[in-house]
Curated annotation (Swiss-Prot):
Family of this protein: Belongs to the serpin family.
Upper taxonomic lineage: Eukaryota, Viridiplantae, Streptophyta, Embryophyta, Tracheophyta
GO CC entries: extracellular space
Region (RCL): 380-404
Protein name as it appears in the record: Probable non-inhibitory serpin-Z5
């Protein structure tokens, strides 16, 4: 199938989230020798999901529920540092799950003294106690969250992982087995030393083919060189339909107010049906469930929109989210309420970035190349979500209808609600851009 043109409208929303990064330890400033940027992490995301072979008996001793809760906070933490470094006051979307998966593969395969130090930094960065804990999280996400449900009426989900290693490096049979059987990853030995550009093209083709042609040129020219040792890849694709679709006849153009005091006219979806909305001090949260299908995974997917009450307070809301442990689980609408004015904008954004500066404060020089595409329309969107078990909103059922008009900048997440996995996170400053 030929890749779709970039301007072609998707029949529903389609999200692909690749990312690629060079990773190496940051050396002390006193050392003047040039350090090779030896590892690269690519994180697109689309794949066939098969049962994972678990090689480590110790994984069974991990409290996966507690480990997953920590990853919810890590996802918001990642969102905050990436937005502050590369997407201040602009449309933005990325995949925390892709970054987590790529770093997990790096941590699991890093050997030697330098590898041990790298692994230690990654564990600290992801707030995990061990590589076993990271692997247990990976297993839970792969076996529960990312199972394709399209044949039973649920979301279309696919995930694929890959690793490219220079042919001059020795291959540890255990590491190779780990990638193939645990991470279900493709493994290839390539020639970075004399054919770096060809390998870059190969990785970009891999990312494109596993995201239905939606993600092109993941790795920019010059990102892979003769000094590259490894490239890790993790691709994710999600396509879901709203539990309750919106009527196109009710979609009307209305003003969306920008931070500079002007406005743009964009199409807003609307509905008179009850919605999952909760009001908090200074902001509201809307939960939009996806159709779940008839499988036995007990998964639930949803998009969350976090809307500040005032137009210029999105940064304050993000700061509150990133500094409050358990924020997502404690700010989760649990009941449908009657709505007064209800409007959310249609939007389609594509965002690519290289975010080495985002990690500079953590003594871990990780340069991520990630591209993500998301579209929201009357039929649905692409993303994964987790439904929290409790809500801080303890009021009785609302008597008066509640308004939810997303006509100014807001944050959004897509989560799987059983595990809390944040697949996609972003912000909208101008739906017309």
């Amino acid at each position: 199938m030929e890749p779709k043109e970039k301007k072609q409208k998707l029949d529903t929303s389609e999200v692909a989230s690749p990312s690629l990064s060079k990773t190496h330890l940051k050396k002390k400033k006193t050392k003047k020798q040039k350090i090779r940027k030896s590892q690269e992490i690519t994180s697109p995301s689309l794949s066939k999901n098969t049962d994972l072979v678990i090689a480590s008996p110790s994984l069974s001793n991990i409290d996966v529920g507690e480990a997953m809760k920590k990853q919810n906070d890590v996802a918001i933490f990642l969102t905050g540092i990436v937005i502050s470094s590369v997407a201040k006051n602009s449309n933005f979307v990325f995949s925390p799950a892709s970054i987590n998966a790529a770093l997990t593969m790096v941590a699991a395969s890093s050997g030697g003294e330098q590898g041990e130090e790298l692994r230690s930094f990654i564990l600290s960065f992801l707030k995990s106690s061990s590589t076993d804990e990271l692997n247990a999280i990976f297993r839970e996400i792969a076996s529960v969250v990312l199972v394709d449900g399209s044949k039973k009426g649920g979301p279309k989900i696919a995930v694929v992982n890959g690793m490219w290693m220079d042919q001059s490096l020795s291959v540890n049979p255990l590491s190779k087995d780990l990638f193939k059987n645990f991470f279900s990853a493709a493994f290839a030995q390539v020639d970075f030393r004399s054919k770096a550009e060809e390998v870059r093209t190969e990785v970009n083709a891999w990312a494109s083919s596993h995201t239905n042609g939606l993600i092109k040129d993941l790795l920019p020219r010059g990102s892979v060189t003769s000094l590259t040792d490894r490239v890790y890849g993790s691709a994710l694709y999600f396509k879901g339909t709203w539990e309750e679709k919106y009527s196109k006849s009710m979609t009307k153009c209305k003003p969306f107010y920008l931070l500079n005091g002007t406005s743009v006219s964009v199409p807003f979806m609307s509905s008179f049906e009850k919605q999952y909305i909760a009001a908090y001090d200074g902001f509201k949260v809307l939960r939009l469930p996806y159709r779940q299908g008839r499988d036995n995974t007990n998964r639930n997917f949803a998009m969350y929109i976090y809307l500040p009450d005032k137009k210029g307070e999105l940064d304050d809301l993000l700061e509150r989210m990133t500094s409050t442990p358990g924020f997502l689980d404690s700010h989760n609408p649990e009941r449908r309420v009657k709505v007064g004015k209800f409007r959310i904008p249609k939007f389609k954004i594509e965002f690519g970035f290289e975010a080495s500066s985002a990690f500079s404060d953590f003594e871990l020089d990780v340069s991520f190349y990630q591209k993500t595409l998301i579209e929201i329309d009357e039929k649905g969107t692409e993303a994964v979500t987790f439904t929290a078990f409790r809500s801080a909103y303890l009021g009785c059922a609302l008597v008066k209808p509640i308004d939810f008009v997303a006509d100014h900048p807001f944050l959004f997440l897509i989560r799987e609600e059983q595990t809390g996995t944040v697949l996609f996170a972003g912000q909208i400053f101008d739906p017309s851009a």
